[in-house]
């Protein structure tokens, strides 16, 4: 079987499938996985508790969040727990790739998927290297604009935001590690601007609907606007990141007898917060369980469990919140909303948004409890 895309979703799925005795080919267009990273890499507490993450691939824990209004009025939130850790994603990808290789996964870098054909239940993949490969099953982990999804005639993402960020060393921010989130409809229409600072590494970024702003220009303006909040005078930019983030929720039709989708290709991102790493890990683990059973039994009924309809029910409120967020383009309305959140009775709502443990439905944990893999 073949997985297209070696981001977090593809790597997680591959390293769970190979130990089941399956012959797994992992294909990615990049030469090395520490190149052209797209995600900020913020892991939430539930992921850190439920999955065995290599500690040396994670930054220091974060339990403080500051939410800023358009006028930079702030709301401070503090959790009793270590809520977030920023992944060193290049290092994490390479570590997970080593797990895959040690488990027998075949690795094909610097290669793009072009198309496939089906004949008598067998798939033939055409790759950019000019070669063709026969495979039993195809998994698309190839991002928000998935070519695999299109060719499998599965559902495609229709709504996304775009994010752009700078990764810095040497930024100075007073106090403990924290996430700073900025509501500003000009710099981040429909989403937020952010500073993720763990005391070692700093991510400064903006996100929003691509038709409403220029991410590069917005990022530069945001950097100048926060000069009184974070000292960047001696900061060294070590990396820039950018990418599409699907925000339409988990897609309904994400599997058939030929292949299935995981990660961003499946829309496995929170519609409200645009956080995708926890859904990615859980959906990939579930996919590995379903594919293993399907290929061992040949029973297509097994695939019915892998339906986006089951997951979307959990996200109804977040889908509505996403629609509301997409329409909030007046700074005055956002300023009023932030003022309300600063009231004690409503600050609990903000606390729940940032620190709540909601993720994919519990059915995923019951059907596919993630296997711990030693690091």
Language-model features: locations:
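Residue-level detector of alpha-helix initiation sites
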Residues: 7-8, 143, 278
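N-terminal FAD cofactor-binding segment of flavoenzymes
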Residues: 33-66
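FAD/FMN-dependent oxidoreductases across multiple families
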Residues: 113-115, 210-291
């Amino acid at each position: 079987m073949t997985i297209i895309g070696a981001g977090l979703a593809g790597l997680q799925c591959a390293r769970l499938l190979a130990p089941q005795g399956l012959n797994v080919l992992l294909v990615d267009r990049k030469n090395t996985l520490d190149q052209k990273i797209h995600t900020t890499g913020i892991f939430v507490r539930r992921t850190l508790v439920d999955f065995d993450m290599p500690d040396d691939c994670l930054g220091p824990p974060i339990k403080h969040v500051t939410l800023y209004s358009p006028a930079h009025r702030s709301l401070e939130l503090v959790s009793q727990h270590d809520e977030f850790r920023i992944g060193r994603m290049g290092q994490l990808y390479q570590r997970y790739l080593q797990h895959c290789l040690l488990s027998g996964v075949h690795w094909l870098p610097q290669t793009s998927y072009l198309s496939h054909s089906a004949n008598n239940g067998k798939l033939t993949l055409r790759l950019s290297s000019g070669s063709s490969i026969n495979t039993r099953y195809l998994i698309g982990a190839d991002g928000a604009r998935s070519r695999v999804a299109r060719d499998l005639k599965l559902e495609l993402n229709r709504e996304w935001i775009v994010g752009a960020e700078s990764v810095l060393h040497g930024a100075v921010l007073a106090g403990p590690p924290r996430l700073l989130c900025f509501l500003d409809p000009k710099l981040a229409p429909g989403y937020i601007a952010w500073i993720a600072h763990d005391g070692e590494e700093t991510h400064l970024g903006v996100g929003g609907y691509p038709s409403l702003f220029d991410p590069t220009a917005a990022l530069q303006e945001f950097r100048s606007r926060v000069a009184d909040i974070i000292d960047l005078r001696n900061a060294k930019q070590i990396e820039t990141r950018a990418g599409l983030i699907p925000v339409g929720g988990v897609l309904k039709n994400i599997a058939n007898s030929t292949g299935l989708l995981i990660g961003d290709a499946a829309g496995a991102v929170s519609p409200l917060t645009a956080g995708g790493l926890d859904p990615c890990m859980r959906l990939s683990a579930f996919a590995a369980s379903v594919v293993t059973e399907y290929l061992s039994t040949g029973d297509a009924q097994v695939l019915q469990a892998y339906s986006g309809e089951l997951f979307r029910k959990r996200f109804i409120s977040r889908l509505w919140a996403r629609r509301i967020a997409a329409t909030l383009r007046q700074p005055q309305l956002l300023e009023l909303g932030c003022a309300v959140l600063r009231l004690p009775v409503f600050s609990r709502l903000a606390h729940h948004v940032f620190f709540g443990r909601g993720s994919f439905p519990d059915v995923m944990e019951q059907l596919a409890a993630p296997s711990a893999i030693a690091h």
